């Protein structure tokens, strides 16, 4: 959980002074016990910090402003122990710039039927206070997640955990800098978009970075540094030397290691956590020059390994997917099955098991590999460098997962997710690349059709662990459209949803 160890979620309890000082003391004691219990549950990956009971508008405003100014705080949980008049929350909610979760719960699980009296009723008014708080949030159009359930319930805790991971991802997104090594692939529409609006709405900052400057880093990487990294490769991967021959194999692997070192150093020096490449922009040097120094191949191996470390990646200049993958990686830290950048490549029509092969030229993250990846070198005839090229080769784990993408529709961004089932492919002896084979849900015909109708991309950020609930929370926190495709999708209902959304997102701006 290293990604979360320096982060906090603040818990603010709502009450009022109407019920006297003794009630406030009890509210405070109960709140501390509940926060300690949630932290001890092991279900919530980010530490919850109790920030006291708010009994007035000034107290609410003070804690919300403090949350905004504390980089450790990624979100606020509110709970109304007693009745807390909602007008006292207006200024604080207007100030709040962090994600909000409203927890509708209660200190006691059951009503003490034999002893209940008006003192108990006045103190334990979550049923009353939370509805009042919910009303003002709805009236103010405050985006928030509402979790209803007993605080010791594992189901409620897991919903909080989802929100907490997403809040961490959103906080990270506001600090992401994505470097484009080269621009978007010419004439491709879906990987392009409005980078200014992207930063304004989602927080990601995208910059062009000259490949010539990257080459300056490459030239400074020593043979000794590259050889040291190659030794690491030997420990992690199965070495498989095929038609390239041993001399070419190790030369290409060594140069791939240099590319990885150079890329990592640039990203670190520039404070970047995401990047894109373009196979047609790998430097201007002539590879046939006897004194050539530079990228002699697409930096696919480097991209695969950097993705595993948490750097966002997008091929062909796809900065939206690079940024989204970074957020996906942050959200799923500590989860078991992994995530990757993937691309729809070719179809396999086989009745109920009709599927789409996911691959790329090289750049698939080994986190999703079912077995130990093989380090191979093969000819790649795409792009400016048509050369023998190093890459990790594997097939993905089987099982259900979610692919996600963000598209620019001109007047707004749309987040799309789709449930898929990764299945085992047949052997592909002449396709030495990493791959996944999946069946879109609910069927190929409906799933693929809905994705196309939504304007989905051919690139996606995929995870076995991150569910629709995460992406729904993510879109809500950022105020962007979200549509999901799953086992319950029908084309007619999905088309109607898209039509309604067109009107809603046009008119919704007038409500804020």
Region annotations inferred by a language model:
Residues 60-73, 90-92, 260-269:
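Short, well-structured alpha-helical segments in soluble
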Residues 52-66, 156:
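Structural motif
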Residues 81, 98, 104, 112-113, ...:
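Anaerobic metallocofactor- and corrinoid-dependent redox/one-carbon enzyme cores
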Residues 25-41:
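Short catalytic helix/loop segments, enriched in acidic residues and glycine
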Residues 96-100, 142:
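A short helix->loop->beta-strand "cap" motif at the edges of active sites that frequently abuts
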Residues 2-26, 175-184:
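Short beta-strand segments enriched in small/hydrophobic residues
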Residues 18-20, 57-58, 84-87, 109-110, ...:
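Flexible loop/turn segments at secondary-structure boundaries
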Residues 45-48, 104, 109-244, 248:
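Cap/lid and interdomain-hinge subdomains that line or gate substrate/regulatory clefts
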